Amino acid sequence: PEDELSDQPDRLLAAEIVREQIYRQTHEEVPYGTTVETETWEERPDGAVTIRAAIVVAREGQKAIVIGKGGARLKAIGAAARAELERELDRRVHLFLHVLVRERWDEERARLRAMGLEPE
């Protein structure tokens, strides 16, 4: 879709900000092999944006670390990322995160290309 191309830089920014918060909140308990995929970006009539993103990890243990006890760490990651996105985009942001386990995701050539990381 046409709107998907125009918001591509913002979609990448959203993924990078969420990824940064994962590293800050997990204190390097989760390897840097974690990635974030912005799944949807929806402009709202009130000027806000709704972003849905997947945090992708390689193992169940990493998923548990990212989610935290009772979802507390995932909530903290989302709150901090949302606040930073609102500052960067200068508008209200509704951010929804979920965690996926995708074994060996980092070896998937198509996904690497989609993230702008061409494998050697």
Protein language model features and the residues they cover:
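C-terminal-of-GTPase-core extension/linker across diverse P-loop GTPases
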Residues: 1-120
